[in-house]
Amino acid sequence: EYHMIMEGKKLSQSTCYQYGVTLKYLLSYVRIKHKVADYDISIIDAAFVNEFFAYLQGYLRQDNMKRCDINGALKHMERFKKVMEMAFNNEWINRNPVKALKAHKEKTDINELDEEAVKRLSTVILPPNLGIVRDLLIFAVYTGVSYEDMTRLTQKNIVIGIDKSLWLSYYRQKTDIH
């Protein structure tokens, strides 16, 4: 909570949401493994960190809970590490045990759409609701606009550019760059 009060103003809404998800997983782990609702931050050690990391990937999880792949678990651990670093800097703990975690991201293959696939997609006849989704995807492919930014676009974002043609003008949600 302290981290969100101090850092929340600097973080995007989606990043704040992700910190909340990490907290939810952490509290769930503490309830399941340690049978308590709250846990003293000063007694978090390497074993706690390693078991929480394993928990994120499926250890001790109920069947209906989503398991993280290693890269997703590492993102949660990165947020946990930042919070623990803040606790260390405020002298609430003597060391940050998350720093000792040794894990590496797995390389993921990114499948790119080639021009032929985009053309095929654009000619498929779909029901109206799926047609809109398809059109938005193709728009994103050609403009490079992220999904997050597309959800915030309105007519006001279409402006006359310096070449007198229609341009898209908006602030990027993630970086606040125009």
Where are these regions (language model features)?
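Short, aromatic/basic-rich helix-turn unit that serves as a nucleic-acid recognition element
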Residues: 1-23
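Residues marking the start of alpha-helices
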Residues: 7, 37-40, 64, 109
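N-terminal DNA-binding recognition helix of tyrosine site-specific recombinases/integrases
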Residues: 14, 21-32, 39, 47, ...
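Conserved helix-loop functional segments at active or binding sites
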Residues: 32, 55-58, 62, 89, ...
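Short, solvent-exposed loop/turn segments that connect beta-strands within catalytic domains
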Residues: 35, 62-67, 129, 161-166
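Basic, Lys/Arg- and aromatic-enriched nucleic-acid-binding interface segment
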Residues: 66-70, 74-78, 89, 93-147, ...
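Conserved tyrosine-mediated DNA breakage-rejoining catalytic core shared by Y-recombinases
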Residues: 102, 108-109, 117, 152-178
